[in-house]
């Protein structure tokens, strides 16, 4: 039985996991660093890298013990090799390559974002293709997931990432780190319509997003208030979260339209299995403001008849740390259901950074014999389109 060991160290969680070829998670160890970074209100890269260096040996021992596995039983070692905080990425990647060399087992460099993108294939066995909203501390983008290593970014944030925005607003409100769960908790107690915040570029007609103006609006409101008590904090958190939900819902509709248009274009003009030329696609070839409304039922019947039915997937996936937010899951699920799609998110413990997703991405690459050289250079920036 094949067993893949995955290592994740791109931010502030040291994680190692072992999964089997049948997608069973034998062990999924995470050593968090929240206490080390809480005093700073955010992740300090140097502290994170040093903590990874201290934690990896213990994490490996724990994962082997819990899974009742010997190192010699491991078939391949997969490790996050970008994007992320480069110090931590280097530490984890070097650790993995050392194991690979010592055990004479294949090394597989994994793009952290691909790990998030494929998590639902580990948990729900979703087939390709599907539309993905990747929302995390460092990224926010809509992605057409057309196959392993075949990704097209339909739109992304042009400034701050969504998770980063949650953390910064939480810090403004003197909430603890990490800020996302604290905002969600406080929002349940507040009035989402108390304060009206801007929704930057919401009417731009594309899938791009902007959160810096929203963050600034929250800061300006806080500075203008004479008193910021618990009730005010709850209302600000609720209004902020409501605004985020409205932005994502609006952009989701644009993404659905563009995604289906891409499928229709490529699967009628390109041999999907051998020659999917994503590099040739330019978003400006498709004017969203003049597209047929393919989200309507009659149009979806047309789509089902216009290209191979096995390629029509009614699943939309939300992944990344922000996907753990139950409010946003509900809002986006209601939005997608209106247009005939179902929204799926990984279990909460697999939304945030973990090594099981890295091990699974490694399994898919292992099965396709997509191995990496031991001199693979870790990357601080690494787009899904450049894998």
UniProtKB/Swiss-Prot annotation:
Record's cofactor remark: Binds 1 Fe(2+) ion per subunit.
Gene Ontology BP, a term: tRNA threonylcarbamoyladenosine modification
Compartment(s) of residence: Cytoplasm
A cellular component term, taken from the record's GO annotations: cytoplasm
Residues involved in substrate binding: 134-138, 167, 180, 325
Keyword Cytoplasm annotated: yes
Cofactor(s) the protein needs: Fe(2+)
Keywords (A to Z) from UniProt: Acyltransferase, Cytoplasm, Iron, Metal-binding, Transferase, tRNA processing
Residues annotated for Fe cation binding in this entry: 112, 116, 353
One term of GO molecular function: iron ion binding
Disulfide bonds: none
Primary location group: cytoplasm
PROSITE patterns named in the record: GLYCOPROTEASE
Reactions accelerated catalytically: L-threonylcarbamoyladenylate + adenosine(37) in tRNA = N(6)-L-threonylcarbamoyladenosine(37) in tRNA + AMP + H(+)
Domain of life: Bacteria
Family matches, as InterPro entries: ATPase_NBD, Gcp-like_dom, KAE1/TsaD, Peptidase_M22_CS, RPE3, TsaD
The enzyme's E.C. designation: 2.3.1.234
Physiological role: Required for the formation of a threonylcarbamoyl group on adenosine at position 37 (t(6)A37) in tRNAs that read codons beginning with adenine. Is involved in the transfer of the threonylcarbamoyl moiety of threonylcarbamoyl-AMP (TC-AMP) to the N6 group of A37, together with TsaE and TsaB. TsaD likely plays a direct catalytic role in this reaction.
Family annotation (HAMAP family): TsaD
Family according to the record: Belongs to the KAE1 / TsaD family.
Protein name, UniProt field: tRNA N6-adenosine threonylcarbamoyltransferase
């Amino acid at each position: 039985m094949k067993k893949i060991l995955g290592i994740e160290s791109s931010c502030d969680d040291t994680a190692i996991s072992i999964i089997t070829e049948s997608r069973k998670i034998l062990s999924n160890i995470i050593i968090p660093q929240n206490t080390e970074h809480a005093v700073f209100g955010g992740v300090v890269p140097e502290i994170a890298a040093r903590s990874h260096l201290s934690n990896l040996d213990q994490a490996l021992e724990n994962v082997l013990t819990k899974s009742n596995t010997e190192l010699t039983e491991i078939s391949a070692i997969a490790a996050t090799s970008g994007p992320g905080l480069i110090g931590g990425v280097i530490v984890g990647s070097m650790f993995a390559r050392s194991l690979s060399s010592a055990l004479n087992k294949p090394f597989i460099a994994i793009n952290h974002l691909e790990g998030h993108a494929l998590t639902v294939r580990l948990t729900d066995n979703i087939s390709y293709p599907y539309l993905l909203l990747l929302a995390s501390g460092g990224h926010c983008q809509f992605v057409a997931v057309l196959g392993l290593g075949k990704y097209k970014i339909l739109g992304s944030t042009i400034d701050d990432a969504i998770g980063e925005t949650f953390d910064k607003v939480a810090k403004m409100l003197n909430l603890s780190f990490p800020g996302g769960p604290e905002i969600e908790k406080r929002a349940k107690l507040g009035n989402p319509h108390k304060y009206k915040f801007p929704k930057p570029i919401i009417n731009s007609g594309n899938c791009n997003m902007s959160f810096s103006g929203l963050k600034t609006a929250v800061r300006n409101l806080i500075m203008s208030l004479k008193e910021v008590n618990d009730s005010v904090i709850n209302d600000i958190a609720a209004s902020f979260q409501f605004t985020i939900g409205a932005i994502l819902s609006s952009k989701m509709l644009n993404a659905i339209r563009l995604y289906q248009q891409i499928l229709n274009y490529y699967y009628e003009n390109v041999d999907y299995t051998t020659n999917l030329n994503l590099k040739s696609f330019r978003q400006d070839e498709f004017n969203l403001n003049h597209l047929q409304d393919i989200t309507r039922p009659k149009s979806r019947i047309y789509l089902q008849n216009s290209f191979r039915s096995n390629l029509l997937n009614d699943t939309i996936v939300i992944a990344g740390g922000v996907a753990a937010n139950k409010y946003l899951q509900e809002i986006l699920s209601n939005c997608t259901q209106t247009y005939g799609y179902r929204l799926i998110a990984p279990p909460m413990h697999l939304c945030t950074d973990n090594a099981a997703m890295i091990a699974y991405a490694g399994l898919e690459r292992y099965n396709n014999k997509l191995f990496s050289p031991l001199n693979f250079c870790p990357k601080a920036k690494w787009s899904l389109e450049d894998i």
